[in-house]
């Protein structure tokens, strides 16, 4: 076992695929807010945040930047209403599209009291890359600490609507349970520091 020292608050958590070192402080976030518009960033304030909703893009191989730009383009195409507060890319990069105090069009009736995270994935399985997974654990743990939540408040889009999203975590319940455990361990570790 190789231990990695990370500056800031860190926790070593693992899942069946890899060892994950999580820094529970704020991750690096590339803030690229969408233009305020009726189709992807309505500019409405959220209520008290009571949960974090995990999604997958359902667009294999697409990048965080491509997904962010798609959301922003909806103001011109009027194709649908869709967005997310954050997008985690294939290399673990994080783009913020909508402030956490504003509604994102991602989780139906839970849009007003949750923060949504879209995740890129390389193929049709919906399984995230190691880099995406690590960043997702870190971002989710940081948001939980920020809003006074626990891993029990982290849900899938599936848990709101029954949609097969995020696909891999819906089809592999054990991987979902392990992800939430990883988030819980990171939160716990951050509280000890």
Located regions from the model:
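Basic/polar, cationic surfaces and motifs that engage anionic cell-wall
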Residues: 12-31, 123-193
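N-terminal catalytic cores of peptidoglycan-degrading enzymes
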Residues: 12-107
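Bacterial N-terminal signal peptides
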Residues: 1-8
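Soluble periplasmic/extracytoplasmic beta-strand elements of cell-envelope proteins
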Residues: 53, 87, 116-118, 155
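Cell-envelope and extracellular/periplasmic
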Residues: 57-58, 110, 115-124
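Extracytoplasmic/periplasmic, Sec-exported soluble proteins
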Residues: 44-46, 78-79, 105-109, 124-135, ...
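Short, low-complexity, polar/charged sequence segments that are solvent-exposed and flexible
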Residues: 71-77, 105-107, 114-117, 134-138, ...
């Amino acid at each position: 076992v190789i231990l990695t020292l990370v500056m800031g608050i860190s926790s070593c958590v693992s899942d069946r695929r890899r060892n994950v070192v999580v820094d529970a402080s704020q991750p690096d976030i590339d803030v690229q807010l969408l233009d305020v518009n009726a189709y992807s960033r309505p500019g409405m304030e959220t209520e008290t945040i009571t949960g974090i909703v995990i999604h997958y893009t359902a667009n294999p191989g697409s990048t965080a930047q491509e997904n962010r730009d798609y959301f922003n383009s909806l103001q011109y195409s009027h194709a649908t209403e869709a967005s997310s507060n954050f997008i985690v890319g294939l290399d673990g990069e994080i783009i913020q599209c909508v402030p956490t105090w504003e509604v994102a069009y991602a989780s139906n009736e839970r849009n007003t009291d949750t923060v949504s995270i879209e995740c890129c994935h390389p193929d049709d399985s919906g399984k995230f890359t190691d880099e995406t997974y690590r960043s997702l654990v870190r971002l989710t743990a940081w948001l939980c600490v920020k809003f006074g939540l626990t891993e029990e408040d982290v849900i899938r889009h599936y848990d709101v609507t029954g949609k097969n999203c995020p696909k891999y975590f819906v089809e592999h319940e054990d991987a979902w349970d392990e992800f939430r455990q990883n988030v819980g361990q990171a939160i716990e570790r951050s509280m000890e520091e």
